[in-house]
Amino acid sequence: MNCLKNCRSYQTKRPLWLYNTSLRFFFNTPMLADVIFKIQGSTVPAHRAVLVARCKVMAAMFNGNYLEASSVLVPVYGVSKETFLSFLEYLYTDSCCPASILQAMSLLICAEMYQVSRLQHICELYIITQLQSMPSRELATTSLSVVGLLKKAKFHNSDCLSTWLLHFIATNYLIFSQKPDFQDLSAEERSFVEMHRWPSNIYLKQLAEYRKYVHSRKCRCIVM
């Protein structure tokens, strides 16, 4: 009984943060942090144990013969602070909620940089889902460059996304062929799009002939 009382007494004196078992509680907080990332003039605290467990690149970086292994302050290049925070949030929480297609692409690039393939796939799925849900009118007027997304996806080895985007451009040929960035497609990409375009030239030709036929039937004078 005395042991139980002492245990309860100890629990009432413990700080509340010790009861929180979610890693989200430690995300972007200096509490128990043992590494600080310096990015775009700002600092972001983190915990090596979490990073090593969740990211192979960081595991090699902090355990190998690299400067980062013995440094508390680690600089980060080639990525914005917002994107890097989203990347760290995924490592801590195993969840990802991009605010836009462009943010998802930036996060995908960061995931490719640190070789976190699952996060890459999540970003790919987000981009595909968002583009699929866009009405044709919005696709025609948006300033978002789908061809630009295709180029980035190819450059960063996102084969699934780049293949889907190429089919998406071909399927919506009449919309994307009118955009200036359509000319940025490579010869190989243009050949693929022309071969798989919809509507196809054959379909458009048949449609024009049918409309011509219908118009001629309406205009014919029929004497009863």
Labelled PLM ranges:
Residues 18-22, 57, 86, 202:
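Exposed alpha-helical structural elements
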Residues 1-4:
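Ankyrin repeat (ANK) tandem arrays and their immediately adjacent linkers/low-complexity segments
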Residues 24, 30-35, 74, 129-224:
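BTB/POZ-protein C-terminal extensions
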Residues 16, 100-101, 143:
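A conditional alpha-helix N-cap/helix-loop micro-motif detector
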Residues 12-30:
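Charged, flexible boundary elements
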Residues 31-135, 139:
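Canonical BTB/POZ domain core
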